[in-house]
UniProtKB/Swiss-Prot annotation:
GO cellular component entries: extracellular region
Annotated organism of origin: Aspergillus clavatus (strain ATCC 1007 / CBS 513.65 / DSM 816 / NCTC 3887 / NRRL 1 / QM 1276 / 107)
Keywords from the UniProt entry: Aminopeptidase, Disulfide bond, Glycoprotein, Hydrolase, Metal-binding, Protease, Secreted, Signal, Zinc, Zymogen
Protein task: Extracellular aminopeptidase that allows assimilation of proteinaceous substrates.
Alphabetical list of Pfam families matching this protein: Peptidase_M28 (PF04389)
Domain of life from the UniProt record: Eukaryota
Signal peptide feature range: 1-19
Cofactor: Zn(2+)
Lineage of the organism: Eukaryota, Fungi, Dikarya, Ascomycota, Pezizomycotina
The protein's name: Leucine aminopeptidase 1
Glycosylation site residues: 106, 180, 232
Amino acid sequence: MRVLAAIALGATGLRGALAAVVPQEVLGTNPHIHHEQEKYLIELAPYQTRWVTEEEKWALKLDGVNFIDITEEHNTGFYPTLNSASYVKYPLKMQYADEVVALNKNLSTANMKANLEHFTSFHTRYYKSQTGIESATWLASQVEKVITESGAANHGATVERFAHPWGQFSIIARIPGQTNKTVVLGAHQDSINLFLPSILAAPGADDDGSGTVTILEALRGLLQSGSVAQGNATNTIEFHWYSAEEGGMLGSQAVFSSYKKNRREVKAMLQQDMTGYTKGALDAGAKEAVGIMIDYVDQGLTRFVKEIVTTYCSLGYVETKCGYACSDHTSASKYGYPAAMATESEMENTNRKIHTTDDQIKYLSFDHMLEHAKLTLGFAYELAFAPF
């Protein structure tokens, strides 16, 4: 997710530090090539592009500048849904309250805590690192376990390891419905320490370990529904854990680019990025709430997300803005798919320890994460049966 400009080390200092250190355990690099740094095409706003080095990418993030890296995907997206009226009609009120409330009772903070403790034990989940591959492998095994234990695998549910050239793969859990119309729930699995990405620890408990385990628990809860697990829902439901969000939404772009090329019909996408930190809001005298993005999102879908929070969560919501390219919903929008995003609070009160060694579990509220899991499950179930 976006980094706050309050991080102490400035971009200038980072450039010098990075230039002085040869990255360790970074996949796909050639230590014998020093004469010219590879450059990447980034987009700072729709159609506003710039060529930068990787070092300059991290400097921009340290300065609080969001971007999407379109080096491999330029000239492929067209942003038809940004800040526009939705072309998909979503339910005006909840249709399955009894079912969703019952399923939400099965959600467990203990499960999320146990999963996040293991997930943050990897030195870093940096997408070019060996431990980034190892963390993805562990996460995929947990997703597969949920699918298998629910019985959904016996009815066509699958877990795909979506390969990328940098090593760490994205993960897609697919629960087929009666149609191929698809609803996507997303989070990003990678972490980063912007000071020295390939060397320093990046536990990434909040960014986005919290979102990762939130939607994993929502998947487990959703599959307690026999109708969904047995493939009787109207629409197909997918849970995505993207690689390389921190590098500029690289993993999610590859996924949604593939979907567009294959004419996949995605009707809605909800991203959960940073779901566990409440201290910032409470210290500011604000109420604990679910943050709902209102910029660079599909407006109709965002209204629906607000209704989900109002109906199924114990907390209210607060509208907030994160600017362009702050998380993977940007990739869905880029390829014409309606997308929305939820986060832990208003952006000015979100976790300022992200992208450092201090993004740790001890600062998080699993009760707050539970509310995001309720949001995820309610969103998935209501739209699983929606007559698109």
